[in-house]
Amino acid sequence: MTTIFYAEPELVIAYGRKVLFLNPNDLQIFKDIELPADLTSCGLKITAPEISEEQQSTSEGKGTDGGKVEVAILNVCYSPDRQLIALTTAGQKALLLYKSRPEHAKLLSVRALARASSAMTFAADSSSVLVTDKTGDCYQYDCVEVNALPRLLLGHLSIVYDILWTPDQKHIITSDRDDKIRVTNYPATFDIHSYCLGHKEFVSGLALLTEEHLLSVSGDKTLRLWNYLSGMELLHHDLPAPAVRLHMRELLPAKRYQAAVQFYDHIEAIGLYELEQTNNIWTVACEQLVRAEAGSWNISNFALTSDMIYVAGAVNEHLALRVYNASDGEQAKTVPAGWLDMVTGSFSDQTCVPEDLSVWFKKRYDNVSDYMERKKRRIEGQQQK
């Protein structure tokens, strides 16, 4: 899985066992993190009783068949105060916490995860981090007492694709494969505050606009805006294709925002939507589609800045990075090709296999049609006798 996001002034790219922190303005590499092939060499231990024997075998660097387990980064997240970096891994499933300052990242802790992570976010005060896994559970990990055991906060019945923690830390917002958006009270996470219901497919991305407004995108080809405290839908906008990624920029506080959406299997790879609030009514003021040479390469993820769109993908099973103007969607000519080659060259020793997003869609089975067809053949057979 390729991770890329922009946290001003840094562009963060992660794939395989490596994370790069870049400054796209002066074309410099701030720092990098490279994980060892075996995380036990940097302190991975099994401490949680609920972790299975399979996880223990992988934590020792071997799979259940005795082969070597490939460590791969799944999620990367900066803390709000920019002092901490959290990342999760597959293979040897772990949560690693780094101190990001000074220049070189310093490893603070390595904690085993019971299952592969699906999403992650920090508390507003950077005191803890929430990690959701592929079975729908959400755990809280302390960033101060790094040896403290994780706390199970909530659970879904399907994989959680995105998670937000409101700035006042009173609500945790999660979205899942079963088209639900849940708003859970915190710290009393046994109490569900509200649901935002209306999507018909997986909800792939969430973004907070104001202290009560939430943006969501889904595989049902819609972008929706909610008052998440009441669960009321305030805006419904049709998209040209299923949405699999969402990034958001604030243009004018509480008034105007830009949402960038990555589409699944569409000739236009990315859509830019400007959302505007006037007299408490939200509208899509303008929209723009960016092709990003879709179809000529496998696009995995993207990052949005004030003037550029950085798109990561795969070409011939190697990581590729291309840059487009946010204003017109054309390929940026101000970014030197040599710099892009330098960045992707840092990952040249790793095979880049695109994530299969088709598994995000729910499979529907029509048993009635099969039954009716068998019944029809049986009746026809009886009539021929």
Curated annotation (Swiss-Prot):
Associated pathway: tRNA modification; N(7)-methylguanine-tRNA biosynthesis
Tissues expressed in: In testis, it is present at high level in hub cells, a niche for germline stem cells of testis. Ubiquitously expressed in all testicular cells throughout spermatogenesis. Ubiquitously expressed in all germline and somatic cells of the ovary.
Any single GO BP term: spermatogenesis
UniProt xrefs under Gene3D superfamilies: YVTN repeat-like/Quinoprotein amine dehydrogenase
InterPro entries tied to this protein: Trm82 (IPR028884), WD40/YVTN_repeat-like_dom_sf (IPR015943), WD40_rpt (IPR001680)
One Pfam assignment: WD40
Keywords from the UniProt entry: Cytoplasm, Developmental protein, Differentiation, Nucleus, Oogenesis, Repeat, Spermatogenesis, tRNA processing, WD repeat
Any one GO CC term of the record: nucleus
WD repeats: from-to residues: 68-108, 155-194, 198-236
Cellular location(s): Nucleus; Cytoplasm
Further remark: Wuho means 'no progeny' in Chinese.
Subunit structure: Forms a heterodimer with the catalytic subunit Mettl1. Interacts with mei-P26 and weakly interacts with bgcn; required for the function or formation of the mei-P26-bgcn-bam-sxl complex. Interacts with nanos; may be involved in mei-P26-dependent derepression of the BMP signaling pathway. Interacts with Myc; the interaction may be mediated by mei-P26 and may be involved in the regulation of ribosome biogenesis.
Alphabetized PANTHER family for the sequence: TRNA (GUANINE-N(7)-)-METHYLTRANSFERASE NON-CATALYTIC SUBUNIT WDR4, WD40 REPEAT PROTEIN 4
Family statement drawn from the similarity comment of this UniProt entry: Belongs to the WD repeat TRM82 family.
Function according to Swiss-Prot or TrEMBL: Required for the Mettl1-dependent formation of N(7)-methylguanine at position 46 (m7G46) in tRNA. In the Mettl1-wuho methyltransferase complex, it is required to stabilize and induce conformational changes of the catalytic subunit. Required for binding of nanos mRNA and repression of translation by the mei-P26-bgcn-bam-sxl complex. May cooperate with mei-P26 and nanos to derepress the BMP signaling pathway. May cooperate with mei-P26 to suppress expression of a subset of microRNAs. May cooperate with mei-P26 to regulate bam expression levels in germline cells during gametogenesis.
Protein name from the UniProt record: tRNA (guanine-N(7)-)-methyltransferase non-catalytic subunit wuho
Source organism: Drosophila grimshawi
Phylogenetic classification of the source organism: Eukaryota, Metazoa, Ecdysozoa, Arthropoda, Hexapoda
Gene: wuho
